[in-house]
């Protein structure tokens, strides 16, 4: 390979994905959705207690189940995204999180709500880490800092626009 070919190849790689800002927006919105969900559940716990007739000890499993599932998935995220492919794993995580969110809202009993919160935690646990990896891959090195700052801003805004 000649020096000119190496330079041309490097220039192509350094440009990043042509749709990189759309990718960053999608990754930020997915992470924002996960962050807002946490504040929504915390605010809704007293209402869920009344609606489902649950004690504080029972309703705590709504948050605990999500957290446990998330904590289990987070360390496996790098391996899973490498095995399935980062884009597929990221898309599957969004899909699992969103479908589980729907079923959480449709749950009519505490055990069903806890089950769907665990499933939601499986999808949500991967969202923040995988979002950052997707953004990092989509941008050239010179723009990664800016993209991560925009991503971080989006994630930090989540709790402020969510219910309090």
Walk through the language-model features, giving the residues of each.
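Transmembrane-helix bundle of Major Facilitator Superfamily
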Residues: 2-164
């Amino acid at each position: 390979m000649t020096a000119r070919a190496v330079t041309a190849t490097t220039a192509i790689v350094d440009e990043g994905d042509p749709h990189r800002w759309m990718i960053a927006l999608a990754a930020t919105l997915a992470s924002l959705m996960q962050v807002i969900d946490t504040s929504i559940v915390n605010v809704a716990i007293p209402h869920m207690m009344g609606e489902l007739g649950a004690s504080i000890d029972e309703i705590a499993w709504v948050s605990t189940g999500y957290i446990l599932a998330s904590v289990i998935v987070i360390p496996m995220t790098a391996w899973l995204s490498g095995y399935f492919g980062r884009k597929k794993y990221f898309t599957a995580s969004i899909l699992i999180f969103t479908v589980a969110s729907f079923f959480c809202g449709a749950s009519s009993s505490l055990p069903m709500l806890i089950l769907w919160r665990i499933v939601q935690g499986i999808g949500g646990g991967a969202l923040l880490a995988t979002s950052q990896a997707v953004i990092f891959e989509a941008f050239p090195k010179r723009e990664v800092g800016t993209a991560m700052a925009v991503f971080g801003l989006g994630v930090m805004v989540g709790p402020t626009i969510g219910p309090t």
